[in-house]
C-alpha cells in the first residue's frame, strides 16, 4: 500500500503536487484557523454579553429596590407619626365632628406623599374599627374600603401580625372611580402602637405598575433583548416581549437576578440569532483576510 502510494506520488505531475501542497499547507490550515477564530469569538461575545447583562439587570433590580425603599420611608413617616397614632388609638371614642377633623388631618399628611411621587395612585389608612381615613381624589364613595381589603390575601397576615409588611404583585383595583384599566402594586404595612405594640390598623399605598416601565424600560435598547420582571410567586409583572420586533426569534439565552429585598426577579432573554449575527460579521472579516492571504501566496 505504501509502495503503491509512493509510486503514485512520484508519477504525479508537478502542477498537481504543488496544488496538493498548497491545499495542505495553506488553504486547509487557514480554514481551520478561521473556524477556531469564529468559535472563540462566539464564546467571547456570549461571555462579555452575559457579564454586561448581569450588571444591567442587577442595576434594574437596584433601581426597583430603591423605589420600594422610598415608599417604605414615606410609609414609616406616616405610621410612626404621633398624631396619626393618637387618631388610630381613639378612632372609636371621638365625636363625629372630631372624626371629620381627623380625616382632614390624615388626608393632608397622605396627600403630600401622593403629590411627591407621581406613581402613587392613592393611599388608605384603616383602623381596626373599619374606619378608612383617606383615599385619593378619585375615590369611590359607594364602597367601604375596610370590607374591600378584608378580601385581600394579605389581610389576615397583617391583622394577625404574621407579617409586618407586604409588597403585592400586580392586581386590578376597584377602589378608584377611574380604575377600569388600572393595574396596581400595593405596599401594605401594619400599624402598631409605639408604646404598647397593640395592633391599630394598616396603611396601604397603591402604586401604578407603569413605574416598572420607567425603571426597566429605559434599559431595553442598551440590552438588546426582552426584559421581564416577575413577582415573588413568579407571575409576570412587566415584560417587553411584545414590544420588540424580532424578539424571541431562535433559542434565547436567559439570565436572571433575584432581589433579596423584594423577592422579585429581573429576567433578560437575548435571542441566539443576535449572537450569530455578530459572529457572522467576524466570519466575513476573517474570510476576507484569508482570501487576501491566499492570493498573496
What is the meaning of each model-derived region?
Residues 14-92:
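Juxtamembrane extracytoplasmic/periplasmic/luminal helical "stalk" adjacent to the first N-terminal
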Residues 135-143, 227-231, 235-255:
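GAF sensory domains
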Residues 116, 129-206:
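Extracytoplasmic/periplasmic ligand-binding sensor regions of membrane-associated signaling proteins
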Residues 180-191, 245-257, 264-266:
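A short beta-strand signature within small-molecule sensing/ligand-binding domains used
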Residues 105-114, 195, 202-244:
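Solvent-exposed, extracytoplasmic
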Residues 69-105, 126-140:
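Extracellular/periplasmic ligand-binding regions of membrane signal-transduction receptors
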Residues 272-297:
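Cytoplasm-proximal transmembrane signaling helix
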Residues 1-12, 51-52, 168:
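N-terminal sensory and localization modules of signal-transduction and trafficking proteins
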